[in-house]
């Protein structure tokens, strides 16, 4: 009898739990399993195709979809200002805990992943101005020197030999060395070796392969990956170790040969910011530098690859961009390596960059926020307090009501159909997040992209090595492309570097 009572009580508790969970968001459409468990959405991420799965979910169920017992996905661009606010912002959810740097058995708060608004403000305020475009243009000579070295490597390895170039890889190597130049006053050896220095890129990717599914069920990450009681669960962070080694090298260089150091590079400014603010924790310099290494090169490389890939897949668009660049060059308006100022007068280039940022946002998992206790209304649906609400940039950028019936296709001209429309489209982007927690480093990406793309097209004729084949995309937080191969030829009149 006692066993039956216990069994009945257990069934009662479980029934009440599932009844409550099921009904809490029952008015919001979505897959049935989503009302009972988060296993489904974890599995979506595990496939590496979450960006397309989430887009298909919205096409099937609408712009507001129940994705978990306490999670709602939204794809309506009109909801961006409400969810990703500048004033009275919604707090980030435990989703971000899996993305937090983990060193010496503890989480190290950083500007991006921390959920604590006070920590975020304390860490962001001293360095925010460094990332402004008005400041970043002072780094142009260092970006220019890396572009020149990049071109010399392309010339000797691919132009002169006729070999096929793994363009996605080389764009990644370029972006990694630019980050080294502006952060540590030196390239990190990626272009020189033509490969992954100390497996930094591979280790970074491995981190996100493990972290991405954990964002959907964070308690699993707490138990398996960050539990000091489990042997082997707390492992060294190879990417952070690489960054720490570069910091130590840089500090040693500044002591021995201060004239060899750019006193205005990111690391110098990070050190100065730390010295001026006693509230900043001891690991701040490490996490600031790590953010540049871990996120800065990936986002830039992905956007560069997306832009070139879609240009090469759309010859009419490529021809239009080359015509614009060549015409400006003939008027004497362009340097061989374009300056930021010179790129401001190339409207079709600007449209192509924005279209790449729309069609292929590098980060394409839903960016979660927590609805406050008072609740809210999104897309006509009441969302109770405590609900996790999120938007996947990939799905948002394919909203046909805003971006048109051809939202799934490459068409830069959509950005040139009037200032008001262009403004609406731009305000509908989540490429670098939204609100006061948007990505600090987005201007670094744009500086590199706007300088490199026209400079490459002035110098080379580029064609897909296998134009009949599609590239491969895998989403592990970053939607990383692979199998992007090209052939390069020097254009007439181009001199060897």
UniProtKB/Swiss-Prot annotation:
Query: What cofactor requirement does the entry state?
Result: heme
Molecular function (Gene Ontology), one example: iron ion binding
What's in the keyword line of the UniProt record? Glycoprotein, Heme, Iron, Membrane, Metal-binding, Monooxygenase, Oxidoreductase, Transmembrane, Transmembrane helix
Query: Where does this protein act, in terms of pathway?
Result: Phytotoxin biosynthesis
Q: Which residues cross the membrane?
A: 2-19
* UniProt-annotated glycosylation sites, renumbered to this chain: 443
Enzyme class per UniProt = oxidoreductase
Q: What membrane topology term does the record carry?
A: Single-pass membrane protein
A Gene Ontology biological process annotation? secondary metabolite biosynthetic process
Q: Which InterPro entries match?
A: Cyt_P450, Cyt_P450_CS, Cyt_P450_E_grp-IV, Cyt_P450_sf, Cytochrome_P450_monoxygenase
Q: Where in the cell is it found?
A: Membrane
- SUPFAM superfamilies under this entry? Cytochrome P450 (SSF48264)
Gene disruption phenotype: Abolishes the production of cichorine.
The record's similarity note reads: Belongs to the cytochrome P450 family.
Q: Quote the function comment for this protein.
A: Cytochrome P450 monooxygenase; part of the gene cluster that mediates the biosynthesis of cichorine, a phytotoxin active against knapweed, corn, and soybeans. The first step in the pathway is performed by the non-reducing polyketide synthase pkbA that condenses one acetyl-CoA starter unit with 3 malonyl-CoA units. PkbA also catalyzes one methylation step to produce 3-methylorsellinate. The nonribosomal peptide synthase-like protein cicB, the cytochrome P450 monooxygenase cicH and the O-methyltransferase cicE are involved in the conversion of 3-methylorsellinate into nidulol.
Q: What is this protein called?
A: Cytochrome P450 monooxygenase cicH
């Amino acid at each position: 009898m006692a066993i039956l009572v216990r069994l009945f009580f257990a069934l009662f508790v479980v029934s009440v739990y599932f009844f409550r969970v099921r009904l809490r968001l029952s008015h919001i459409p979505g897959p049935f399993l989503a009302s009972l468990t988060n296993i489904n959405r974890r599995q979506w991420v595990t496939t590496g195709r979450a960006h397309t799965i989430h887009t298909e979910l919205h096409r099937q169920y609408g712009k507001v979809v129940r994705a978990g017992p306490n999670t709602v996905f939204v794809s309506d661009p009109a909801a961006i200002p409400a969810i990703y606010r500048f004033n009275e912002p919604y707090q980030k959810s435990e989703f971000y805990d899996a993305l937090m740097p983990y060193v010496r058995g503890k989480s190290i708060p950083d500007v991006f992943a921390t959920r604590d608004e006070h920590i975020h403000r304390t860490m962001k305020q001293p360095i925010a101005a460094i990332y402004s475009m008005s400041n970043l243009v002072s780094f142009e000579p260092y970006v220019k020197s890396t572009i020149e070295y990049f071109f010399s490597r392309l010339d000797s390895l691919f132009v002169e030999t006729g070999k096929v170039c793994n363009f996605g890889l080389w764009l990644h190597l370029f972006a990694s060395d630019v980050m080294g130049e502006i952060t540590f006053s030196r390239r990190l050896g990626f272009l020189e070796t033509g490969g992954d220095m100390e497996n930094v890129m591979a280790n970074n990717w491995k981190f996100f392969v493990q972290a991405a599914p954990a964002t959907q069920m964070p308690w699993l990450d707490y138990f398996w990956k960050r539990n000091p009681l489990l042997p082997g669960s707390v492992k060294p962070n190879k990417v952070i170790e690489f960054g720490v080694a570069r910091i130590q090298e840089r500090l040693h260089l500044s002591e021995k040969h201060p004239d060899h150091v750019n006193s205005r590079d990111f690391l110098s400014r990070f050190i100065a910011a730390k010295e001026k603010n006693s509230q900043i924790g001891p690991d701040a310099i490490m996490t600031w530098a790590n953010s540049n290494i871990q996120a800065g090169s990936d986002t830039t490389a992905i956007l560069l690859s997306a832009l070139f890939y879609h240009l090469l897949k759309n010859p009419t668009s490529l021809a239009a961009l080359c015509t614009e660049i060549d015409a400006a060059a003939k008027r004497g308006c362009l340097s061989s390596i374009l300056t930021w100022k010179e790129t401001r007068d190339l409207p079709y280039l600007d449209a192509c960059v924005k279209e790449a940022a729309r069609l292929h946002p590098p980060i394409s998992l839903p960016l979660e926020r927590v609805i406050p206790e008072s609740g809210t209304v999104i897309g006509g649906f009441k969302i109770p307090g405590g609900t996790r609400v999120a938007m996947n940039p990939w799905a948002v950028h394919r909203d046909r009501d805003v971006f048109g019936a051809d939202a799934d296709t490459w068409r830069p001209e959509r950005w040139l159909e009037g200032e008001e429309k262009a403004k609406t489209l731009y305000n509908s982007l989540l490429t670098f997040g939204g609100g006061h927690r948007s990505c600090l480093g987005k201007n670094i990406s744009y500086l590199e992209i706007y300088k490199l793309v026209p400079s490459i097209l002035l110098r080379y004729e580029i064609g897909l090595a296998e134009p009949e084949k599609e590239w491969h995309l895998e989403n592990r937080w970053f939607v990383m492309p692979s199998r992007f191969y090209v052939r390069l030829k020097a254009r007439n009149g181009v001199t060897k570097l």
